[in-house]
A protein has these predicted regions:
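N-terminal small/glycine-rich loop or linker at the start of catalytic domains
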Residues: 1-16, 86-91, 121-129
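Alpha-helix-loop-beta-strand connector modules within alpha/beta enzyme cores
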Residues: 51-76, 146, 150, 206-211, ...
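Single conserved hydrophobic/aromatic residue that forms the stacking wall/gate
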Residues: 291-300
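Catalytic alpha/beta core domains of metabolic enzymes, predominantly
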Residues: 119-242
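Mid-to-C-terminal alpha-helical segments outside catalytic/metal-binding sites
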Residues: 263-292
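C-terminal helical cap(s) of enzyme catalytic domains, especially alpha/beta-barrels
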Residues: 251-268
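Flexible, glycine/charged-enriched surface loops at secondary-structure junctions
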Residues: 37-38, 72, 160, 271-280
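Glycine-rich, proline-tolerant flexible connector loops at the mouths of alpha/beta enzymes
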Residues: 38-58, 190, 248-249
Length: 300
């Protein structure tokens, strides 16, 4: 199956990156029409375009997608509230207010509880993410509490593993019963500085450590995104494309989410692979959709 990562942290780099809940929903729906069975969504601050965890924005986004006439599995990020930026090389404390947004487990899960997407992601560890003083921060105690909160919700977790240790910890959580009753589904996030590089040796190391009863997807970023459609398929993984991880269809040609999904579909069908639809994905991942309700007044 194909997941479309609709928007990340690149709002100023392409006119096609959606910002408002309406724009994100429209882009997600177009990606679904192009063949994505799952849409993975973040929301943005309406004034700055920066990533937001405002539950009202998530509610509007969710309602817009669910009130459309296009069927798609909704996957909301659970990665917000884990942003830590040190104060500088010589003075790491106090933390920099710009770029720091740390929240407790319950607050980080608030929009998931209120919107009840079919899937929500968990970033499975801490890492130096990109350059400078920024650290993606997920303590083991917080990850354990987030896993416990998933057990109370009709939402399946997607375990985003940016390195081998993240996958190791996800397996440890399952062994301790923290995901009891849940479908285990790993997203192997390759080539994100400074996690696991996206060479094939490292990909195979990740794939070979995913338990056989788990589902898995894999992606890379930038110009390697479309190459990884074929690479992921060859190692038995599902795929992800979209503007969260790559802005270009080809050199110098900026893409839309739908165009990236269309290109991925061409690659998969050229490999004689069938692309699954949303209902097939729901059945495979044991997604509960009996809880879904449409907004009383559809957005127009």
């Amino acid at each position: 199956y194909e997941t479309a990562g609709t928007c990340g942290d690149t709002v100023n780099k392409s006119p096609h990156v959606p910002v408002t809940p309406e724009q994100i929903a429209d882009s997600a729906i177009e990606a679904a029409k192009a063949g994505a069975a799952i849409v993975h969504c973040h929301v943005r601050d309406l004034d700055t375009g920066a990533q937001s965890r405002d539950p009202d924005l998530y509610k509007e986004l969710t309602d817009r997608i669910r009130s459309s006439d296009t069927d798609v599995v909704l996957n909301l990020t659970g990665g917000t509230g884990a942003d830590l930026t040190l104060g500088g090389i010589e003075n790491p404390l106090p933390l920099s207010e710009e770029g720091t947004d740390m929240a407790g487990a319950t607050e980080r899960m608030r929009h998931v509880r209120e919107c009840l997407p079919e899937i929500a992601t968990i970033d499975m560890g801490t890492m130096n993410f990109g350059e400078g003083d920024y650290i993606m921060t997920n303590s083991t105690s917080q990850l354990d509490e987030i896993a416990r909160q998933f057990q109370d919700l009709p939402v399946q977790p997607e375990l985003e593993c940016f390195d081998t240790g993240h996958l190791w910890y996800a397996k440890n959580q399952e062994e301790r019963g923290l995901f009891e009753g849940k479908t285990m589904n790993a997203q192997l996030c390759m080539g994100v500085p400074w996690g696991a590089p996206d060479d094939m040796n490292t990909l195979m190391a990740m794939v070979n450590n995913v338990p056989l009863h788990w589902h898995k997807s894999a992606f890379s970023i930038g110009r390697r995104q479309l190459e990884y459609v074929a690479a992921a398929a060859l190692v038995g993984a599902n795929i992800r494309v979209g503007l969260e991880d790559n802005l270009y269809l080809s050199k110098g040609v900026k893409a839309t989410n739908a165009q990236l999904v269309e290109r991925a579909t061409v690659i998969l069908e050229g490999m004689n692979l069938n692309v699954m639809g949303p209902d097939e994905v729901r059945d495979m991942l044991a997604v509960s959709y009996t809880h879904l309700t449409l907004p009383t007044t559809p957005y127009v």
